[in-house]
Amino acid sequence: GLKAGTPVVAGAGDKAAGATGMGIVTPGAVSATIGTSGVVFAATDRPALDAQGRLHTFCHALPGRWHVMGVTQAAGLSLRWFRDRFGAGAEDGRDPYERLTSDAARVPPGADGLLWAPYLMGERTPHLDPNARGALIGLTASHTRDHIIRSILEGVAFSLRDSFTLFEEMGVPVKSIRLGGGGARSALWRQIQADVYGHEVEIVEVEEGAAYGAAILAGVGAKMWNSVDAACSAAVRVAQRVAPRPAVVRQMNASYAAYRRMYPAVRSICSKMEP
């Protein structure tokens, strides 16, 4: 067994640990991470409950704190789906996702009117609907492969923005937004998120937030710091900030309004096709 006196420290669930590793521990601090799924996670000092089940509320990794989060089922999965079905372009030694986002960067914000609904696996936020379906709307003969890729990047960001819309509805404050996951490695996707959210976004130095968060919690338990707040202030550092572009924010607001009309329209069509 363990030697007598060895500290044993409780950790946290994956999202709470990841948020701790990004410094998302005080009210107003929010993270938006894009992996296979996408998660918008807000730290709170009270349980913020959504009676409709569109957001999920849990205890945080530190006493007296909670977190509320929204989930996009197919965030990074949308881009992976495109890669797997249609390819990532000619091999040139770069990562396939770098090639895809580089292609998308050739297209202006708004993808010339093309919209993507990323509901490839049903959805959780804001539509708690296992039968939600994905859609590409606005396609014309002038659109290219690059337009489709950009519309996917923007559509995922619109889906994550839905969580921020619900936070506002519920009175959950948003003072800072930190990006994480594989999506945060793309300069284009970082800028798209800043423009879609209409808010400066930050990138922290350490990418592996969950492991880093578990290490921070262990350090607090071992008395390296006297609190998780103090530990995050000392150990979590911002590497980059990305500002939204006002003209693009206005354009993204208009696109988001159109995006919000997609789900009910597609749901109405698809419900009539179900056996």
Feature annotation, model-predicted:
Residues 1-2, 12-29:
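Conserved phosphate-binding catalytic cores of ATP/NTP-utilizing and phosphoryl-transfer enzymes
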Residues 4-9, 201-204:
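Short pre-catalytic strand/loop immediately N-terminal to key active-site residues, enriched for Gly-Thr
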Residues 10-13, 98:
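A short, flexible low-complexity segment enriched in Lys/Arg and Gly/Pro that occurs
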Residues 32:
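Conserved active-site beta-strand element of glycosyltransferases/polysaccharide synthases
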Residues 42-275:
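Glycine/Thr-rich phosphate-binding loops that ligate phosphate moieties of nucleotide
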